[in-house]
């Protein structure tokens, strides 16, 4: 699915007719809920969380604000790679890596939790 999306993007242009630059980020994980983590989430009418269930983690869930990129730290094996890729792609920004597993456990990450609230 990711490769199909990449092929579609490669064939598109922005409103000024420029090719879209694609920056590939590594995939963390696979990451899963531990039994302790799954049991520690308050029950709600949303999705249940089960031990061993895979977490939906992505380095693309970052936030750009005031000359900084706030990047979720997800996996010690791939965090540094993601930081380097984004720093090279966005040299005018300071990359700030933030431990964010607790946010990930509830679903989503930095970009998701900073979205606007409609009036």
Predicted regions span which residues?
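Histidine/cysteine-enriched polar flanking segments
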Residues: 1-119
């Amino acid at each position: 699915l990711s490769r199909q999306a990449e092929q579609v993007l490669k064939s598109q242009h922005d409103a000024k007719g420029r090719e879209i630059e694609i920056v590939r980020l590594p995939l963390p994980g696979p990451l899963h809920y531990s039994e302790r983590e799954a049991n520690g989430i308050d029950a709600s009418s949303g999705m249940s969380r089960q031990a061993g269930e895979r977490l939906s983690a992505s380095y693309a869930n970052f936030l750009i604000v005031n000359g900084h990129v706030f990047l979720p730290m997800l996996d010690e094996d791939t965090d540094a790679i993601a930081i380097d890729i984004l720093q090279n792609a966005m040299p005018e920004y300071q990359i700030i890596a933030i431990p964010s597993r607790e946010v990930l456990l509830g679903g989503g990450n930095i970009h998701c939790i900073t979205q606007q609230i409609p009036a």
